[in-house]
Amino acid sequence: DLELRQCLPCGPGGKGRCFGPSICCGDELGCFVGTAEALRCQEENYLPSPCQSGQKPCGSGGRCAAAGICCNDESCVTEPECREGAGLPRRA
C-alpha cells in the first residue's frame, strides 16, 4: 500500500486542502467547489503521486472534508458523521 501524501494546500491563506481537481476544503473554510479558491487543485492532475486529504472515510469513497461535509474527488455532500466531535481526531 503506497503511502499517500496530503494533497496540495489551497484556499485563503492555504488553509484548505484539495480534494479533487475543483474542490478545496478546510475545517475553518468549509468547501469551495469550482471556484477560484479551488483553481490550484487542478495542479494535482500533473503530479505523478496520488494524494489524499481528510481524516475519516465517509460516504462512497469520500473523506470528511470540513464540519459536516464529506467529499470525494468529484463532489461533496452533507454528512452528519463528519461533524466536530463525531469521532474526528482532536487537534491541539
From Swiss-Prot:
Protein name: Neurophysin 2
Cited function: Neurophysin 2 specifically binds the midbrain peptide hormone vasopressin.
Lineage, top ranks: Eukaryota, Metazoa, Chordata, Craniata, Vertebrata
Keyword Secreted: yes
Similarity-based family: Belongs to the vasopressin/oxytocin family.
Disulphide connectivity of cysteines: 7-51, 10-24, 18-41, 25-31, 58-70, 64-82, 71-76
One of the record's GO molecular function terms: V1A vasopressin receptor binding
Species whose genome carries this gene: Equus caballus (Horse)
SMART domains: NH
GO cellular component: extracellular space; secretory granule
Gene: AVP
Keyword field: Disulfide bond, Secreted
Cellular location(s): Secreted
